[in-house]
């Protein structure tokens, strides 16, 4: 099964990308993400997915728990996360099956994907920095994996000669 997932920058992009065939909209929310170009208000979040790819310090666990509660109230589709504390607290709110592990550059093998799937999350997003051959091998071994096929990716973390 193929799903087209789009990270939007502007709310005005939602309807046009849905009309073009997107199955899922991802939004960056203020205080939930460190990398989204545009950070929306939590009030804009309804029945979409959220990019929650920041790290939480020990003194921010109450903030994290409240953010997860807010997302549950808004019927979030998926939560893209990289900090394991998100998984830990999502269990208490029955949100684990909404989680997508997206640590940008760390998911590089079928074992990485299997580790998180065994914990009940929806799926993992493969690193966009691995080769096409590596990606194909993982896709042959594991079902329901997210692969970035277009867009701006974090190239500064790669040690490969990309340019």
Can you name each region flagged by the protein language model?
Residues 118:
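Residues lining hydrophobic/aromatic ligand-binding pockets adjacent to catalytic sites
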